[in-house]
Amino acid sequence: IQIREEKNDWMVWLIYAVLTILIFYCMDTPNIFGRAEAGDHFHAHAYYNSVYNVYQGLPYTDTLTSIYGHYGLLFKIPMKLVGGDFRMFVLMIAGLGTLAHVCAFLVLELTVESRILRVLGAVAAAFPVLGMRGGYYWQVWPHRMIFPMILLLYAAILMKKQWWNVWSGLAGYLICLLAILWNTETGVILAVAWMALFVSRCLAGGEWRIGLLIRTVLVHAVCVAASFFGAYGIVNLYNLSKHSPANTLGE
């Protein structure tokens, strides 16, 4: 896999566009009883309820903390703008799911030379959502996919432009902080992966010294911890603003 230089692959871009429209259409499914499957309305209710709680200003407690993360905080302002409307919330979810796929298509465009492989990769990425038309599993799409795709696209752009510096690294950890806030386990994995990317670059940079490697590992370990505790702090600032005790790490 190499960074591709040729442009104007209009047929590939047309396929991206068609898939993007189909993905949005498939994910915009506000009728949670449409397939008459209990899992659909259970999944939809669980996800929306945790967002609606934050919209109403409820603090996170041991009984109200969502098992999927604290994504409700990132939905709070958009939900205020639409008055907590469920129909508009589904549109937001469809938009996020579509954005995750667009990021995946752009990663393919930046990193894969073969047109056939790019098309096959795009179809494969879209297949899970297109294959469950009318179904609900927001807990995976877009929930556990949006930030991995954003970070992967960001890394691909850095590779394309060779923008490797302190600030680009910190921007990656900012994305990881938001990812941890959104969904804890996914965000922590992304932060560790972002650290591993810089460590691997250190090892691949020709001659390297053990001192440089140790310093790189330590600096990025601190950044991973800062991403985690930054997200933890944001949750507790929200709780304190609602006159509720701070959450423990266990909560």
Model-derived regions: residue spans:
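Membrane-interface micro-motifs in multi-pass membrane enzymes
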Residues: I116-M159, W182
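Short hydrophobic alpha-helices at membrane interfaces in multi-pass membrane enzymes
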Residues: V119-G121, I157-A179, W208-L218
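Specific aromatic-rich, kink-prone transmembrane helix
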Residues: H143-W163, G172-C176, M195-R201
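Membrane-interface helix-boundary motifs at transmembrane edges
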Residues: Q2-N8, L108-I116, K160-W167, G205-L213
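Start-transfer (signal-anchor) and selected internal transmembrane alpha helices
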Residues: I1-D28, V219
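Hydrophobic, membrane-inserted alpha-helices
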Residues: L74-K76, H101-V102, A125-V129, A171-L177
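Transmembrane catalytic cores of multi-pass membrane glycosyltransferases
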Residues: I23-G72, K80-L96, C103, A126-V129, ...
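Transmembrane-helix signature of membrane-embedded glycosylation machinery that interfaces
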Residues: M92-G95, A104-E113, A155, M159
